[in-house]
Amino acid sequence: MAGRSCLELGLFCWVLLAVPVGPQPASSVPGAPLTTLTPPPQSEASMLSLNLGLNFKFHLRGPAAVWGNPVTETHPLSPGLGQESEEEEEGDLRTDPLWELLVGSPGNYLPEWGSAEGSFTPWASSLPPESTSRLSGPTKRPTAHSQPRMGTVTWATALTATAPPTSAPRPHQSELELKFDVALRAGAAPTLGHRSLPLLPSLRASLAEIAGRLGPFGFFGTTVSPLRNFSRQSYPGTTAHPSFAFEVSDSPGLFGTTGSRPPPLLERKFSSPSLLDSVASPSSASVKTTPVQQDPTVSTSGPDELSPASFGNPSTQPGCEPGSCSEPELLDDLGQPPASPLPLFFLTLEADWAEARARWGLAWEAHVYGAGALFGLVALLALLALALLPWRCPPGAPCLALLDLLLLSAGTTRAFPLFYDAYGHRDRLPTLVWLLLQDLPLPCLAAGLGLACLLLARPRTPRCPAGLAALLLLGLGLAAAAALGSAVHRPLRPLRLASRGLHAFLAAFLSGLLLALSCWGGRRRRAGAPLGGAGFKGATPVPQVRSPFAPRESWRRAARTAPVAGTFGLLSGALQGYEVLHALGYGSQAGLEGPWPWWAFQLGLRLGEVGVALPLALLGLYPALCSPRVPRRCWAKLFRLSPGHAAPLLPGGWVPGIPDKEPLGSAIARGDAELLQLCALAGPGPDLLLQGGGCRGFEGAGANPTQSTASSPSSDCTVDFRPPSPINLRRSIEEALCSEALLAPGLFQGPAFGEALPGLGLYRTISLGNKIGAGPSEKSENVPGSPAPPELPSPGAWPPGSSASSGSLCGLSRDSSSMLLCSSPDRPPRCPLVCVLSPPRPSESSPSLPASGSYQALSPPSRDSPEHASELQAEEALLQEQFLDACRQIDELSMGSDTIDL
């Protein structure tokens, strides 16, 4: 005995100096509930490395009672220590009954420790079959121990660290030490020719062990395996056999334990496995399945084991009748497993729909119909904006139309499945259609966020860049390919994770960018000055095409709406990212499974998507409803296919054909600039606008006024009127009155011309004076009292040959700044305006009453008129009253700034 004790002590010290590094956990494959562990082939150059976790593992093993009753009673220790030492010196590990008990059949070997395919722990081969780890709590069924076969190590014995049953006898201390040494020796692995110092740890093996312990399952905490999903109803008549128990590895991860994979019969009971059921551990190739022999009359679901009811199934599991759960029947079922349905969710429901809806009650209805109504509202707003865009044509209409189309698609694809078959609980939709409806709205919302960033970032009209279009097409293509691949080929299911992860990243990034742009409004460059500002003079400037949010009020509305979309976009991206991590096995905590956490998570996803889509729909509706200007209709542009649809632009006579009556003032000479059409040139070309009237940029339109070509006396100051009137009414008014200063402000666009052109006379009066001075029938004498050139010529009668010589006279205005036409005393007073518009409405009111608005009355005739002053005063009063009445009629009958409706 003393020699044997010394030999045992020496062997124990040798093991302490050189102990192998702990192996990685061996994972299971689908359809393999019970497996055996196989050691790797031995090599001649074997070296044991120091195990860093020796003390920790030895502490977890506990006292000698962990060996349990089956080990101490079934297999006596047959080999002697001398024989074992000889085997160790020779390098040939033969099998013995104890070795068969620990690792299985003689042909199987333990994998190399520290490699990619490793066993679980050095002590894993000697663990009892009972399991104390659970995920959902104990069941109410009686306890019984499942007895493994001789020479076979099951997952319950190899991957579970438990305490011995109370009925197990405590073995002798010497047997404990001997078996402890044998377990260490059995776990010894070669280094395949690589020699290292026995006292130094193997860094490669230690890192491999740490990586095996921490990933992919159990990194953040207690994780229910993503390889199962219980969110759909079970097939009728399909039950899980009680002889297959769900085993749980008690290997401590970073913060807790990790649930291993259930057998396929359990997946058949809960018929929605998760997305990554094709993901398996590296050691899945060397796994052999063996069913458990048990007494059929005794139930195997104890408080320390997991039953299907512990995963949320409310239905009672029928027990096996005597002889009904025999081994051949189980093998037949395993040989032809039914095709498991496609996983629809990344987060498991952990219950069937009947129990879940019973727990939710009205919360389920509020979730489904409330979210569906909100998505329907998004679709209606997008449709309304699309209908209004052709009639208003705001700047940036193509980008706004694309934004509305994306929101319409996202709203309809979310609202329809919620109303028709919410989350697929009724199985009304095909799997491929359901997956497409779930995945396609995400790239649409991400592209909508990108378009919103473009609309807010540019002061000018945005154009959809090729990068955003390519990103949209990439997202849509990836989502469609992931849904199609998941429905057709199960190994392609990780594509859904890639698609969802990409959209989560894009949603978070673009939402943060949108928040930054909306908060950057204070430093944003001013898009343009309002019309009629301090720097504006003269004709109406040609409006530049700008961003739909260039006006201040539109920008304020957008700045109040965009941060809401950005905030909810960040929330949606975070939830989608967590969903992807949970599908990979990270992020789950104990107590977060069940119907209510699933309901809250799905509600958060829907609210995040609605919070992004609804503000974006309002953002696209603002320019169509609240555009600061009313431009030309887009439908008119579309249907105006030929130039004949518009009024012809005629130079010279301005009227096609020979006029019936020679217009008033036809003898007025016109320069070359006056032969231009009555339409302002919006494109590049000669500057025909008045002083300060051109839009030379967003700022400083009037800061640097320059003399334009239209500022000369020979130019026509009516070239900015557009479009030309079919009856040339505007030209007739101008020629009859010789000045736009008589018109009310705002009548034909822009401010009052009297304010716009201070100190500038009527340019055509100079040409009139030139005509009078250079006409062949004119007398050469000068009228006394006329100012000297270059001042305006003195007023006088029209030339005898003109058609207006008997109807009007020419006179100076009150401030002597322009020459006006006055009625002739030879005939009764008449006004061409009143004759054209409506009969005169004489009034007995005093002619000295101030004119309404800012109308300017005609000046009295000059002092050189042959008529007496007493006769002319009455005529002047009546003429002024008629003129003011005509101006009022023009204001009442004018429509906008384009034409005059008679």
Swiss-Prot record:
Annotated stretches, region: Disordered: 72-92, 121-149, 281-333, 701-723, 774-811, 839-872
Ranges annotated as spanning the membrane: 371-391, 393-413, 432-452, 468-488, 501-521
Membrane topology: Multi-pass membrane protein
Coiled-coil segments on the chain, per record: none
Subcellular localization(s) per the UniProt record: Membrane
Low complexity bias spans: 799-811, 843-854
Signal peptide residue numbers: 1-18
Chain positions found as Phosphoserine: 642
InterPro entries: PRRT_domain-containing
Pro residues compositional bias, start-end: 786-798
A GO cellular-component term linked to this record: membrane
Main location: membrane
Keywords: Membrane, Phosphoprotein, Signal, Transmembrane, Transmembrane helix
Name of protein: Proline-rich transmembrane protein 4
